[in-house]
Amino acid sequence: MSHLVHLTVLLLVGILCLGATSAKPHEEINRDHAAELANECKAETGATDEDVEQLMSHDLPERHEAKCLRACVMKKLQIMDESGKLNKEHAIELVKVMSKHDAEKEDAPAEVVAKCEAIETPEDHCDAAFAYEECIYEQMKEHGLELEEH
């Protein structure tokens, strides 16, 4: 599995661990609930069953609609707000979920998110979601945060 695919898998696991609805972003969900959420987003984004399968199997998006599916899930989990910007509080929680706990690096999740919050992102929310995803992984690596294996 390529490095980027592996990172995408972990990001999606982290996102899906945070919550299922915008009202309860930090509730854990199971695979069935994640599929339900992805299918809800499928209808909203024009994504296909294949795009949902790709998301559920943690493969990189190939089509624009698949990126939009990812953005939709991020918005429903309040990782990304309705204007396409990173939600600092929820993104920090995401980084904490995704990384192994290291007391010496307690401030690192906030630093990761601060860097990613400041990046120039495309106006298109679908492409922005992907840009944030890449930034989070890059910054986690730079801050020495190890990804939690799920």
Curated annotation (Swiss-Prot):
One of its GO terms (cellular component) is extracellular space. GO terms for molecular function: odorant binding; pheromone binding. It holds the Pfam family PBP_GOBP. PANTHER family: GENERAL ODORANT-BINDING PROTEIN 19D-RELATED, ODORANT BINDING PROTEIN-RELATED. Disulfide bonds join C41-C72, C68-C126, C116-C135. Expressed in the antenna, mostly on the anterior surface of the third antennal segment. Also detected in the maxillary palps and in cells at the bases of the taste hairs on the proboscis and internal taste organs of the head. The gene is Obp19d. The keyword Lipid metabolism does not apply. Belongs to the PBP/GOBP family. Residues 1-23 form the signal peptide. One of its GO terms (biological process) is sensory perception of smell. It is found in: Secreted. This is General odorant-binding protein 19d.
